[in-house]
């Protein structure tokens, strides 16, 4: 377990690190990132310390709520044609936050089925079916190390947004499948650690990321999402 510590201040955070170190011993490693927040750079930094055949990106504001979720994801990711597996993420009221990502939705890309109940099947039951999609969120994303090394690290130009979608696009372009596994479920307490995108500076950064993503993947955006 690699935890990247990024300027935390709460005592309970560090108490949690100590508890994990006692529980997992040498399997747990805390590494420090002293720079500003850049989601791509922080994950790339942490991955340098990982030794496994598979890499799981997992946000600090998530909680696994379905037993065996990570095993389900790993079982799928072991297939040779699969490059990435993503999970179903729920808000704390058990409505859907993420059930896959659709290219071109909400402008550039957006989460599918956001706001429906966890027990709602959705259009053609697609909210609850294991399936191939264009992209999944990196809040909980499992990928092969070999694939990560083949397509390259997360693009650090995307400091906060679109880095996961960009990585999925690179993996799909390399010929691998992106799989959404709804039977792997987590709560995602989004924005509780960083805050919402509600300041002028954040909006300016977000706008730049949108333009960079469009410039990079214009042809694919014009063509449309093949899974939607």
PLM segments and residue spans:
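C-terminal, non-catalytic tails of nucleotide-sugar-dependent glycosyltransferases
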Residues: 20-23, 83, 93-94, 105-133, ...
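Short aromatic/hydrophobic "clamp" motif used to bind/position activated sugar donors
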Residues: 55
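Acidic donor-binding segment of Leloir-type glycosyltransferases
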Residues: 1-35
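Short glycine/serine/threonine-enriched helix-capping/active-site loop
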Residues: 85-88, 181-182, 189
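Active-site acidic Asp-centered loop
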Residues: 6, 58-61, 155
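Glycine-rich, basic loop-to-helix element that forms the pyrophosphate-binding segment
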Residues: 33-50
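A short, conserved alpha-helix in the catalytic core of glycosyltransferases
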Residues: 69-73, 127-152, 156-187
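Conserved donor NDP-sugar-binding/catalytic core segment of glycosyltransferases
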Residues: 62-108
């Amino acid at each position: 377990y690699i935890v990247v510590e990024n300027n935390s201040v709460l005592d309970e955070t560090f108490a949690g690190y100590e508890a994990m170190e006692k529980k997992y011993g040498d399997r747990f490693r805390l590494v420090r990132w002293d720079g500003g927040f850049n989601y791509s750079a922080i994950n790339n930094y942490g991955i340098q310390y990982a030794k496994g055949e598979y890499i799981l990106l997992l946000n600090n504001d998530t909680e696994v709520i379905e037993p065996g979720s990570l095993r389900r994801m790993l079982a799928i990711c072991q297939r040779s044609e699969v490059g990435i597996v993503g999970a179903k993420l729920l808000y704390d009221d058990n409505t859907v936050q993420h059930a896959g990502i659709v290219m071109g939705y909400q402008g550039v890309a957006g989460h599918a089925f956001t706001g429906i109940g966890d027990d709602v099947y959705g259009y053609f039951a697609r909210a609850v079916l294991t399936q191939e999609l264009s992209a999944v969120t990196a809040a909980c994303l499992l990928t092969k190390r070999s694939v990560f090394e083949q397509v390259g690290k997360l693009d650090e130009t995307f400091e906060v947004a679109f880095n996961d979608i960009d990585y999925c696009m690179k993996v799909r372009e390399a010929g691998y499948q992106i799989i959404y596994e709804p039977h792997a479920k987590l709560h995602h307490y989004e924005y509780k650690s960083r805050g919402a995108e509600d300041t002028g500076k954040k909006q300016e950064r977000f706008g730049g990321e949108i333009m960079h993503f469009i410039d990079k993947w214009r042809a694919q955006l014009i063509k449309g999402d093949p899974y939607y």
